[in-house]
């Protein structure tokens, strides 16, 4: 048997990588309404729980509702040739999007929340 040859010397040198200054991509946190949905659920039905799938559905529903209200409000502002979105446009959008008693209840709760916020910030 012939003796094994040593591998040929390579002329390539190992290239050291320069230290990178790039930051690792942080995971983007998605904000949900889950804690608020849970608080309302416990106010209405203290002994009832909610599954993760149902919570995701409720979160999507709230996001969709807010998006529709914002879109309708912005259309009303543009239609009236104004530059400022006020509570009046939001109330009108709610009246257009929600049926009857639900719209009246939503408007009264919204007005109550705005009044509470205004009085606390003064």
Curated annotation (Swiss-Prot):
Signal recorded as keyword: no
N,N,N-trimethylalanine found at: 2
Keywords, in A-Z order: Acetylation, Chromosome, DNA-binding, Isopeptide bond, Methylation, Nucleosome core, Nucleus, Ubl conjugation
Compositionally biased spans, kind Low complexity: 1-10
Compartments reported by the entry: Nucleus; Chromosome
Function statement: Core component of nucleosome. Nucleosomes wrap and compact DNA into chromatin, limiting DNA accessibility to the cellular machineries which require DNA as a template. Histones thereby play a central role in transcription regulation, DNA repair, DNA replication and chromosomal stability. DNA accessibility is regulated via a complex set of post-translational modifications of histones, also called histone code, and nucleosome remodeling.
Subunit structure, interactors included: The nucleosome is a histone octamer containing two molecules each of H2A, H2B, H3 and H4 assembled in one H3-H4 heterotetramer and two H2A-H2B heterodimers. The octamer wraps approximately 147 bp of DNA.
Protein's name according to its UniProt entry: Histone H2B.2
Native species: Tetrahymena thermophila (strain SB210)
């Amino acid at each position: 048997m012939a003796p094994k040859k040593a591998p040929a010397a390579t002329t390539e040198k190992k290239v050291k990588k320069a230290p990178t200054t790039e930051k690792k991509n942080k995971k983007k946190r998605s904000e949900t309404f889950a804690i608020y949905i849970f608080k309302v659920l416990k106010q209405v039905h203290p002994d009832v729980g909610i599954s993760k799938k149902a919570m995701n559905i409720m979160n999507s529903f709230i996001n969709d509702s807010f998006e529709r209200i914002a879109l309708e409000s912005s259309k009303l502002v543009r239609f009236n040739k104004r530059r400022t979105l006020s509570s009046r446009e939001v109330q009108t959008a709610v009246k257009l999007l929600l049926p009857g008693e639900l719209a009246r209840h939503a408007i009264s709760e919204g007005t109550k929340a705005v009044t509470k916020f205004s009085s606390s910030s003064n």
